[in-house]
């Protein structure tokens, strides 16, 4: 059986992973109906409320997401997974265990993230914000980096990503 591709979109909250990921999902679905869209916030709801936002819990959550992506990929399903994914160990695991793994790092400045803060995370002061209260491990070897400080629309970002993927 052919394995699916896992498009792992990673960045901090508010950088655009869900928006760009949803556009990518729709684009793939036009030609390949066997694709699913997974978002970190939704996955937390699906898996239940047993994990919080400590560094240890975030790592457990990220590994759940990674294993689910591998399971789906092993069954020939393409997966667009949008998650903060702040650990090198998780991204390394993905590269070692998911044959069709594509890592997309969407990078935005903290100033941009604070402006876009729809969830109120960057002003909450609750001590659990990745990239503010917890240092993240920025991806060292993403397949592509999409700078997203507002110079391009999500559709333009998608076009850059699609052009990159077509070259692969």
Residue map of PLM features:
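Hydrophobic anchor at the beta1->P-loop junction of P-loop NTPases
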Residues: 9
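P-loop (Walker A) phosphate-binding loop of NTP-binding proteins
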Residues: 12
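ATP-binding Walker
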Residues: 15
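Walker A/P-loop
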Residues: 18
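Conserved substrate/cofactor phosphate-moiety recognition/catalytic segment
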Residues: 21-67
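Loop/turn-to-beta-strand initiation segments
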Residues: 34, 74-82, 102
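Conserved phosphate-donor/acceptor-positioning beta-strand/loop module used by diverse small-molecule
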Residues: 81-82, 97-116, 146
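Small-molecule kinase domains that catalyze NTP-dependent phosphoryl transfer to phosphate-bearing small molecules
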Residues: 107, 115-160, 164-168
């Amino acid at each position: 059986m052919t394995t699916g591709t896992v498009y792992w979109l990673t960045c901090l909250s508010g950088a655009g992973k869900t928006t760009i990921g949803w556009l990518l999902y729709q684009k793939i679905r036009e030609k390949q109906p066997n694709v699913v869209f997974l978002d970190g916030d939704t996955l937390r709801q699906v898996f239940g409320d047993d994990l919080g936002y400590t560094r240890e819990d975030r790592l457990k959550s990220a590994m759940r997401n990674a294993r689910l992506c591998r399971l789906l990929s092993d069954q020939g399903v393409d997966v667009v997974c949008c998650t903060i994914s702040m650990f090198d160990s998780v991204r390394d695991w993905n590269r070692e265990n998911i044959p069709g793994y594509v890592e997309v790092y969407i990078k935005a400045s903290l100033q941009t993230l604070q402006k876009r803060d729809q969830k109120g995370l960057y002003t909450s002061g609750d001590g659990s914000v990745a990239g503010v209260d917890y240092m993240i491990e920025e991806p060292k070897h993403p397949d592509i980096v999409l700078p997203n400080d507002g110079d391009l629309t999500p559709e333009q970002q998608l076009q850059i990503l699609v052009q990159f993927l077509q070259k692969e």
